[in-house]
């Protein structure tokens, strides 16, 4: 919600969402559409965007569709202008684009690493650079960055993805510092664990093996609901999922251990996984089947709860074990 004159708050009804054609972006568009108002939806796949927009219109929202690539700064600036003209103002901008490639760093071409950084970091910076002047002119606004668990700990087999998310985390922290003189402009970060979206189906794959997401896996609608809550009550950071909280706790104490555990787990999985073709995925072109919210990776609720518990206990036990095994520093050393 945005503060108006007199100190009261008005609902966020003018929303911009990038990466809105599937997954978390689509779920968030539909969640905001249920509240009415005006939505501006952007992504590379115009056809998939139109399908999402039609669903949102049926829910009662007015919708503008803008096909673009967030790595194109000029296109993003035009998106911001079009959104302001369509809505009259911009209450919340959800910077949601994310791509990636899975594989050992040296096995993935540098052009793929560069593309990942351009989309996941420069793309979000383009979003902020375009909308923050509008926020400052209207003296309010909420900018939401989709980061992920990858912004809290190193990600073996996804080095560029992890670098982009660490960079995005630092970028958000810097923006928050710069916005302190604007009390009604908020920079919010969302850190979900693994989410059941089509993203992994569309990722670049340089492992030669089939990809899957480790449990527990979040419903994209849960992440969307969290973004909607930020519209009502902005906060700096929002962590979602047991693995995220576990890593947030453990990483400051044992960053190297966490990375080694992750590398070992991925290595064991790929050693026995089914073979799959090497592909660049959707990094340079949108996939033909890019629509849909769900990726089809989730397990039944009982198994999800067990997996969540196992993840939390496993990380905590690893950190405790490391603490017991680490040699204590002696006085004077």
Show the residue positions of the predicted features:
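Conserved glycine-rich cofactor-binding loop
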Residues: 21-22
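Conserved glycine-rich Rossmann-like NAD(P)H-binding loop of the short-chain dehydrogenase/reductase
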Residues: 37-52
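The beta1-alpha1 cofactor-binding region of Rossmann-like NAD(H)/NADP(H)-dependent oxidoreductases
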Residues: 46, 68-78, 110
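Substrate-binding pocket helix/loop in short-chain dehydrogenase/reductase
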Residues: 104-105, 112-117, 316
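Active-site helix of classical SDR
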Residues: 128, 164
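SDR active-site lid
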Residues: 180-274
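Hydrophobic alpha-helical topogenic segments used for membrane insertion/localization
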Residues: 303-330
């Amino acid at each position: 919600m945005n503060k108006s004159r007199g100190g009261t708050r008005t609902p966020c009804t003018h929303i911009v969402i990038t990466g809105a054609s599937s997954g978390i972006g689509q779920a968030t568009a539909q969640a905001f559409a249920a509240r009415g108002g005006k939505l501006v939806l952007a992504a590379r796949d115009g056809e998939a965007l139109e399908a999402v927009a039609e669903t949102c219109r049926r829910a009662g929202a007015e919708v503008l569709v803008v096909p673009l690539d967030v790595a194109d700064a000029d296109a993003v600036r035009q998106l911001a202008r079009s959104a302001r003209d369509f809505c009259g103002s911009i209450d919340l901008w959800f910077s949601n684009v994310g791509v990636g490639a899975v594989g050992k760093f040296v096995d993935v071409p540098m052009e793929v690493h560069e593309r990942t950084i351009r989309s996941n970091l420069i793309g979000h910076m383009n979003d902020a650079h375009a909308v923050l002047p509008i926020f400052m002119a209207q003296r309010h606004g909420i900018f939401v960055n989709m980061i992920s668990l990858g912004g809290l700990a190193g990600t073996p087999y996804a080095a560029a993805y992890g670098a982009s998310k660490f960079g995005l985390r630092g970028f958000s922290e810097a923006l928050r510092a710069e916005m302190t003189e604007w009390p009604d402009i908020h920079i919010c970060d969302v850190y979900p664990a693994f989410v059941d979206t089509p993203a992994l189906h569309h990722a670049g794959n340089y492992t030669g093996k089939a990809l899957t997401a480790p449990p527990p896996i979040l419903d994209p609608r849960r992440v969307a609901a969290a973004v909607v809550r930020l519209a009502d009550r902005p906060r700096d950071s929002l962590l979602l999922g047991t693995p995220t909280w576990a890593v947030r706790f453990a990483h400051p104490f044992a960053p190297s251990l966490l990375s080694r555990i992750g590398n070992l787990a991925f290595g064991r999985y790929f050693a026995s996984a089914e073979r799959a073709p090497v592909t660049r995925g959707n990094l340079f072109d949108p996939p033909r089947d890019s629509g849909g919210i769900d990726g089809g990776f989730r397990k039944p609720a009982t198994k999800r709860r067990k997996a969540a518990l196992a993840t939390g206990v496993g990380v905590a036990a690893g950190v405790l074990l490391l603490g017991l095994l680490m040699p204590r520093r002696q006085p004077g050393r």
